[in-house]
């Protein structure tokens, strides 16, 4: 085998077996390309940590939240990353605003659309016999309908990027298999995530032929305001987000519709 053939063999091996795993890192660090992510709910908790870690990786971040003027930590980050961090107002239940922002960013490719915004609804509001159905509507609006609307509005931006990923922060609480083992709880939150998962699977099937990967990642029980009061052992946000970013890097068109736990294992439906 001559040298050219050897080089070709090595290139193909790396592309087929190593490339998908490290494609995001290679594109951002070795090719000079600067990827962009748009993150919802970026002012605190997991969304804020996503913002920090993607900025540290050299990405451009469009951080969205309902009240940017009150997002002190985001605004402090802006001072350190003036050229890489944009902070924009967005509430995922406001579909008109989603459309406005999509139009405003029409010339901006978005490599990873990161649907992070979510609410639990509060455990006391979803107890059988005393359920607050207005709260249920709110949970569905944020956790289920919001990510679908975001995906539809920002599809052109993702399509025009290099990495082409639509990622949603889901939960193992959306797994019917796990619910059967864990028992009844969190009616609103669980069902919102189960419905979200089905939407994202449908979206993955719809967009696979267009080269767009769709995936769901689970942070596990994480020590944030979102999880306050829940009787679970908690993981630090820094660790949870680092795990999810690693899993996002591994989601490609080949394994689109992936439903991935923080440890990299597939969550049963």
Where are the model-predicted features located?
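Catalytic loop of short-chain dehydrogenase/reductase
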Residues: 119-120, 127-140, 145, 155, ...
């Amino acid at each position: 085998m001559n040298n050219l053939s050897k080089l070709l063999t090595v290139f193909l091996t790396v592309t087929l077996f190593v490339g998908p795993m490290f494609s995001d890192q290679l594109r951002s660090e070795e090719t000079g390309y600067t990827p962009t992510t748009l993150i919802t709910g970026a002012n605190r908790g997991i969304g804020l940590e996503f913002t920090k870690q993607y900025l540290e990786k050299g990405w451009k971040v469009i951080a969205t939240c309902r009240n940017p003027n009150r997002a002190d930590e985001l605004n402090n980050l802006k001072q350190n990353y003036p050229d890489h961090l944009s902070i924009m107002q967005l509430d995922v239940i406001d579909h008109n605003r989603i459309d406005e922002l999509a139009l405003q960013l029409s010339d901006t490719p978005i490599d990873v659309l990161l649907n992070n915004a979510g609410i639990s609804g509060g455990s006391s509001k979803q107890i059988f016999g005393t359920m607050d159905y207005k709260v249920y509507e709110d949970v569905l609006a944020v956790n289920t309908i919001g990510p679908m609307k975001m995906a539809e509005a920002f599809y052109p931006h993702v399509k025009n990027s290099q990495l082409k990923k639509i990622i949603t922060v889901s939960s193992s609480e959306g797994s019917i298999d796990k619910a059967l083992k864990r028992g009844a709880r969190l009616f609103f939150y669980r069902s919102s995530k189960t419905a979200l998962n089905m939407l994202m699977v449908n979206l993955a099937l719809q967009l696979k032929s267009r080269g767009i990967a769709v995936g769901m990642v689970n942070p596990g029980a994480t020590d944030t305001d979102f999880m306050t009061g829940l009787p679970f052992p908690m993981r630090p946000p820094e660790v949870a987000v680092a795990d999810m970013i690693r899993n996002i890097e591994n989601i490609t068109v080949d394994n689109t519709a992936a439903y991935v736990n923080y440890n990299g294992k597939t969550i049963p439906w």
